[in-house]
Amino acid sequence: MLKILIKIIGIYQRYLSPLTGPTCRFYPSCSTYAKESLMRHGLLKGLWYSAVRIMKCHPYHPGGYDPVK
């Protein structure tokens, strides 16, 4: 399951993300953050960290540097 999610994120990064251009207000981007958190923390914790990060991605959050912990 973990490898499938990482593959799906990779497909998104390769084929869909270039169509919208650089729109993420964070570094690393939310999709890169999700891949790194899944690889570092495993499925459940990685999904949790990814969901929290995506919920912070809105116009009222300043964004900036937010590495995977």
Swiss-Prot record:
Membrane topology: Peripheral membrane protein
Annotated compartments: Cell inner membrane
GO cellular component: plasma membrane
Keywords: Cell inner membrane, Cell membrane, Membrane
Matches recorded under Pfam families: YidD
Presence of the UniProt keyword Cell membrane in the record: yes
Disulfide pattern: none
PANTHER family linked to this entry: MEMBRANE PROTEIN INSERTION EFFICIENCY FACTOR-RELATED
Function: Could be involved in insertion of integral membrane proteins into the membrane.
Family as reported in the entry's similarity comment: Belongs to the UPF0161 family.
Full protein name: Putative membrane protein insertion efficiency factor
